[in-house]
Structures are given as structure tokens and as C-alpha cells.
Amino acid sequence: MPAATADHPGTDEAKPLTEVANRLMDRLPGYRVEIIDGMLTVAPLRDGPHADALTTVMLPLLSAGLSDGDTEVEVLQGIGLRLPSGPEDYAIPDLSIVDADFDDHLTENNCYDPACFRLVLEVTSESHRTDLRHKVTAYAQAKVPVYVIVDRKHGRVHVLTDPLPAGYDRHEVYAPGQQAPLPASIGAEVSLDVDEIVRAGSPKR
């Protein structure tokens, strides 16, 4: 959605987008508010299949021993990632694999330096164009090594690696019936079962 700004009462000075974003989060619990390339975006509450797909992704990561306290990484949901594209820019990936010392990388507005992120993952919703386009550039510019997209609309899993200034150099697309291997740099050898993830993310009717 378009950028949102507000004026200070009695002045012509615009409020920082961060202040607007924080107020929106207070008023809309459960909604995801982000600032990407200077644009404020608001994603609605996730549905059940979105959460089911996310759980299905997490299970093999946890089964591989990630985030068990003995590894160098943690698997986390919904933490803020500071973006270099603007002074207030940040994103909130659905899932992240971060260095175990991520607390040492806390920056402003409860976000974390992208240097501690090994992987980010988005499960698409109605804002799938943001995940498939704008966030590709945003995460690449932040030099996040791996970006995974669960595209529920088209029933595919995208694995993007090798970030460049305008996007990722490698972009692999996997369909149901295939395994989507993740780079060992995340901390373990893990492949995602695309069929299981796509079925989990489909409407339950």
C-alpha cells in the first residue's frame, strides 16, 4: 500500500514513518507493518493455512538440530531486520535463521542488523507481489545470503541465493514432488518437501 505520513499538530513537519508504523502496530494487533524503500506497508492478519505452511517449514529445520541450544544459529519468527535502503527502513520476515548472538546486533526500533541473518523466509499472502518483487531487492541489498519464498498462489517454493545490489544471482524454483535444498551455510543440511508445504498452505475446504 502507499506510503503513509502524518503531520505534527499545528506544524508542517511530517512525523517520522517509524512513529506512524509503531502507532499502526498498536492499533492493529497482529498486523505486520514494515517500511521498505521509504514506503510504509501494512499486511493483514495471516490466515490458518499461512501459519500451517510456516509450521511445516520449521519442522525440518528444528529436526536438523537448528535452534537446539548447541548450534551457532537460532530459528525465529517475526523479528525485525534493519534494511539499508533508507534510515527508517525495516522488514519483518515470517521466519529467520540468525546467528546465536543476534542479541548483540540489536539496533534501533527493536530491529536487528542484517549481518546476523543467514536466511529469511516469507510465506505469501495477499501481498505476494511484495514478497516476490520488492523484498527480493530489499533483502539482497541487505546482503541476506538466502531468501526463501513459499508462493501459495502458484504452489511453488523459491530459493534465492548470492545477493547482488539489485537482486539475487541465483533463483531456483521448486514444484510439488520436489525437494528444495537449502545451502549448508544456514547451519545444517536441510531440504524442504515442497508438496507438504504447498498442501499445508492451501485453503482447507
Language-model-derived ranges and their functions:
Residues 1-119, 123-142, 146-205:
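Gly/Pro/Ser/Thr-rich low-complexity, intrinsically disordered segments predominantly at protein N-termini
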